[in-house]
């Protein structure tokens, strides 16, 4: 796993550059990126979560209740290891590709539910393919600060660029 770190105010630039040529350049050099968007993973999970619909409709008028619903959704996401399972599942597709590399995008979508460090901790020993994570945040020595405002997290085991 390696992190390509960039300032969070560059999210749109990185996304546009990725779509406008970075993947094509990599393919030309023999690297086959397979993209996993964490935004898409979350969207699919929450779309299928009946609790989100029922509780969300009841809480829409009450800010405290809405925060409780939001916190519960985050707990469901973490307890079911939705993101971890999506990464490990996509890894199986990458294994079938010659020179396959898993490219994880849109990790800003996991805020405020979690950060990527705890996800890496859970999957680290199960990773069998190269993974590149587009990481909006800051490097601080050997630590990373997700989105530039979370506290430094020195628990990342991987390389940071």
Language model features: what each stretch is:
Residues 9-13, 41-43, 74-80, 107-112, ...:
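Short acidic, S/G/P-rich loop/turn micro-motifs used as interaction or catalytic elements
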Residues 96-113:
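Conserved P-loop NTPase "ATPase switch" module shared by AAA+ and STAND
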Residues 79-95:
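A short, acidic, amphipathic alpha-helical segment used as a generic capping/interface helix at domain edges
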Residues 20-35, 122-132:
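Structural alpha-beta junctions
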Residues 12-18, 44-49, 112-118, 142-146:
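A short acidic (Asp/Glu
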Residues 114-161:
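Glycine-rich, aromatic-bearing surface loops/beta-hairpins
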Residues 33-81:
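Long, charge-dense
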Residues 1-26, 31:
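Glycine-rich P-loop/Walker A and Walker A-like loops and their local beta1-loop-alpha1 context
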């Amino acid at each position: 796993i390696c992190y390509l770190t960039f300032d969070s105010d560059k999210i749109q630039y990185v996304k546009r550059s990725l779509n406008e040529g970075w993947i094509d350049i990599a393919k030309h050099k023999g690297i086959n990126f397979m993209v996993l968007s964490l935004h898409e993973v979350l969207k699919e999970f929450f779309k299928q979560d009946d609790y989100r619909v029922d509780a969300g409709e009841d809480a829409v008028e009450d800010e405290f209740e809405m925060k409780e619903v939001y916190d519960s959704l985050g707990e469901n996401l973490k307890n079911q290891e939705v993101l971890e399972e999506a990464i490990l599942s996509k890894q199986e597709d990458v294994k079938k590709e010659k020179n396959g590399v898993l490219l994880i995008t849109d990790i800003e979508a996991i805020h405020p539910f979690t950060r990527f460090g705890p996800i890496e901790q859970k999957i680290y020993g199960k990773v069998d393919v190269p993974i590149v994570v587009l990481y909006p945040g800051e490097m601080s020595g050997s630590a990373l600060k997700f989105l530039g405002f979370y506290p430094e997290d020195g628990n990342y085991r991987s390389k940071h660029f």
